[in-house]
C-alpha cells in the first residue's frame, strides 16, 4: 500500500474528482485516500460503508468505473482504487455496524427480490426502523450473487451488516401480482411502499419508470 501514498499526495482534484464523480455510490475518494494514508483503516472502512450497504460484496464485484475515470492514466496508470478498498476491508479491525436507538416507524415496506439491490434497500429501510418484509421466490437470498461469489462470502456480509436490524423474510414466495400488496379501500393492511428488485429477466409488473425503454438502460448485473 505504501506504493500508492505518493500518488495520493499528487492528486490535485480538490473539487469533485473525476473518479468520485464516476462512482455510482459517490464514495468520497479524497477522504478515503486521506484516511488510508494515515493508516486509519477503521475510519476508511466507515467511509466506504456510509455509501455502500455491503462493502465486502460490492468491492468484489465492482467494475471500478473510478479507475477508468482516473486522470492519473494520462501520466502512467490509474490509481488502483478498488484494490485499495479491498485492502481496507481486510485491514479494518472494527467492522461491526453502528447501533442506533431509533423509534420504530409504522410504515410497512415490501421488497420483492432478495438479490443485492433488494437486500441493500431492505437494509437501509430496516436501519431507519421501518417494518420491512422481503419476498423471495427462491429458497435462499442473494440472487445472481451466487454466480459471482461463494455463498458463504456474501451470506457472512449480509449477516454482519444486518446484525442490529430486523426484517421479515419470506422465501419460496413468488409474487406475480403486486395488487394484493397495495393499500386499497378493501385492503388496509397493505404495504405503504413496494420496492421491485426482481433482477435481470425478472417481473417488472409493468411498473413504468423514466428511461425504461432507453437503449442505454441495462440491468446492474449486465454492466
Walk through the language-model features, giving the residues of each.
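Short glycine-/acidic-enriched loop or helix-start segments at secondary-structure transitions
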Residues: 121, 144, 181, 205-207
Amino acid at each position: 500500500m505504501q506504493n500508492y501514498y505518493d500518488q495520493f499526495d499528487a492528486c490535485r482534484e480538490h473539487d469533485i474528482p473525476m473518479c468520485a464523480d464516476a462512482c455510482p455510490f459517490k464514495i468520497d475518494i479524497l477522504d478515503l485516500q486521506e484516511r488510508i494514508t494515515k493508516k486509519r483503516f477503521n475510519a476508511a472502512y466507515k467511509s466506504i460503508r456510509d455509501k455502500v450497504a455491503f462493502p465486502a460484496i460490492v468491492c468484489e464485484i465492482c467494475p471500478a468505473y473510478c479507475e477508468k475515470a482516473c486522470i492519473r492514466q494520462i501520466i502512467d496508470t490509474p490509481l488502483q482504487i478498488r484494490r485499495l478498498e479491498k485492502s481496507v476491508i481486510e485491514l479494518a479491525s472494527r467492522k461491526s455496524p453502528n447501533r442506533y436507538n431509533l423509534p420504530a416507524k409504522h410504515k410497512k415496506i415490501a421488497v420483492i427480490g432478495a438479490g443485492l439491490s433488494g437486500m441493500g434497500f431492505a437494509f437501509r429501510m430496516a436501519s431507519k426502523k421501518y417494518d420491512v418484509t422481503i419476498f423471495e421466490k427462491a429458497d435462499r437470498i442473494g440472487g445472481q450473487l451466487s454466480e459471482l461469489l461463494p455463498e458463504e462470502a456474501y451470506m457472512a456480509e449480509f449477516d454482519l451488516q444486518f446484525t442490529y436490524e430486523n426484517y421479515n423474510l419470506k422465501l419460496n414466495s413468488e409474487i406475480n401480482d403486486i395488487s394484493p400488496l397495495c393499500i386499497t379501500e378493501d385492503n388496509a393492511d397493505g404495504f405503504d411502499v413496494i420496492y421491485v428488485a426482481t433482477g435481470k429477466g425478472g417481473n417488472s409488473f409493468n411498473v413504468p419508470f423514466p428511461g425504461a425503454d432507453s437503449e442505454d438502460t441495462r440491468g446492474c448485473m449486465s454492466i
